[in-house]
Amino acid sequence: MLAQLTGAGKVPAILVLEDGSVFRGVSIGATGKSVGEVVFNTSITGYQEILTDPSYARQIVTLTYPHIGNTGTNSEDEECKTIWATGLVIRDLPLLASNFRNSQSLDQYLSSKNILGIADIDTRRLTRLLRDKGALAGCIMAGDVDEAEALETARGFAGLQGMDLAKEVSTKDTYQWRDGSWKLGSGYAPLAEKRFNVVAYDYGAKSNILRMLVDRGCDLTVVPAQTPAADVLAMNPDGVFLSNGPGDPEPCDYAIDAIKVLLNENMPIFGICLGHQLLALASGAKTIKMKFGHHGGNHPVQNVKTGEVMITSQNHGFAADESTLPDCLEATHKSLFDGSLQGIHRTDKPAFSFQGHPEASPGPHDAAELFDHFIELMQQRAASNV
């Protein structure tokens, strides 16, 4: 039994879903009670990057791969210093964590961040349930467990639709970012050559997105989600990046209004994930809540024009509705899993976006060329201003 292997299993834990389903297991991490929308991620590796992705705010993350924690945790694989997810669900926590960068076990890491987790449950059963019924509200209780209280807590969760979480997870202060990608033996590479001044809106930005922009010569100024467009334009940027983030895009009026102003200024714009949805809304399209969303590192996406297929990392529960695209937007990419819209480009402005994660931390970098297209748009703008 897991309890005999880890020492953490002496503390009982339960996961109760709003439909009344109960999963009994053992506690990892903190004790107490947490609630959120329960989703599943199919990635095999990268559990620390997944946990620290701000897009999981108010969500309990189920990892479908059975062995989680094999490599421990470290200070370099965090996408954000804060864990915004409200819980973690796994099958097995291995006895040993083996990696030359390991500094803390997963159990210790969760405890240090005050995050609840539950292990030793049938994650296959849970995943099938979420696949069939859609994402459900759930409550994890660890320590003194009470099924009735957990069920009441789960059913009291308001859900993510209509919830603006971007302003909650966003930075509160403007700051500079000049760290590039990580390299073995040397750590994060500094900005080598400044080619462009880019303002990045932080709606819950993953650090690896910022690193890949720096790799391409972007000197980044990261601003809070609610920063007015006038303040951004006063910084005289060569381009504006719209980050990923959690929650429903529709309530983010401040972001939609700012993007409209930037579009009117013909500013080169690149959006990822939530940023993609916000660009769609600012351009006149609508968004929808998905049944259980896309969460994983093996999602095939096709380029509509070229037919090229790339394997992508995905993490979203909302999507832009292709049937509502106005004439100024063209669909550029589609999911080969369900046909949902994955990319758009303005036909009249230097602005485009992608639903998946081309920076893929964790996951493949098949779509990294999208960063290069952003560079091309900024180069074209610079050439036209000569």
Swiss-Prot record:
The active site is at C273 (nucleophile), H357, E359. It comes from the Bacteria. This is Carbamoyl phosphate synthase small chain. Its EC number is 6.3.5.5. It is an enzyme of class 6 (ligase). Keywords: Amino-acid biosynthesis, Arginine biosynthesis, ATP-binding, Glutamine amidotransferase, Ligase, Nucleotide-binding, Pyrimidine biosynthesis. InterPro entries: Anth_synth/Amidotransfase, CarbamoylP_synth_ssu, CarbamoylP_synth_ssu_N, CarbP_synth_ssu_N_sf, Class_I_gatase-like, CPSase_GATase1, GATASE. Disulfide bonds: none annotated. One of its GO terms (molecular function) is carbamoyl-phosphate synthase (glutamine-hydrolyzing) activity. L-glutamine binds at S55, G245, G247, L274, Q277, N315, G317, F318.
